[in-house]
Amino acid sequence: MHNTLQYLDKYIKGPIDACIILGSGLNSFIDSIKNKKILEYEKIPGFLKTKVEGHQGQLIIGEINNTNVICANGRFHYYEGHSFDKIGFLIKILKNYDPKICLITNSSGCLNLNWDLGSLMVANKFIDYSFIESNKPKIHNYKSNDYLNKLLSIAKKNNIKLNQGAYTFTTGPIYETASEIKDIINHGGNAVGMSTFPEFLNCKKMNLDNIVISCLTNYGAGLLENETIKHIDVLNNANKYKNDFNNLLIKFIESM
């Protein structure tokens, strides 16, 4: 970690206001960052390489309306063979620069047919459906903060549809079956994905305020007839629905 920070200190001057972790297909957000420096993960000592399509593996340092940000364009997943602790290495690095908030984003499956695809969801609880430490799904409550209230207010003011609900973590890499989706819904899940939860736990462990925002790119298996879920469709839909996602993050960061 020392070598990593020593390398990054050459490019990061002063404290950071917000850090952002981008989910699959949501990388158009980086176009909003000004005066940016782009560092490739593979050139940063101690960093892992990203392998999943839609995760470029870049750390972007810059500004949004004079607000200092670090943006991780690419994340690491449990199904790639990384432990929660390894996934949390990125959070530990970001925490070193004293961000006020960590915005953890993802593209996820929508489990509520009353919600339109392309709408956004902010997590107010988490369901650990990984069965790594328990033979039952485990509920983790989200501790609300002033930043969450601000985000909800900004969404309302700008007519951005922002639902609140439970994000469900599965290990992947295959998508859930229709029976699994039904069970997740019965446990109160509103969105499902293969990331984010490890980062949330690491933020919680380090007392780093965080908000989890999901772009709902597809409906869960079995909710629509004859629909097959493919990763390329998730990426395409994330790009298709990028405007509200980008606008919400930009407006929120500008308000800091």
List the predicted regions and their residue ranges:
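Generic non-transmembrane alpha-helical segments
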Residues: 7, 11, 150-160, 247-255
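Non-catalytic positions within long, well-ordered alpha-helices that form the structural scaffold/packing
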Residues: 94-98, 185, 204
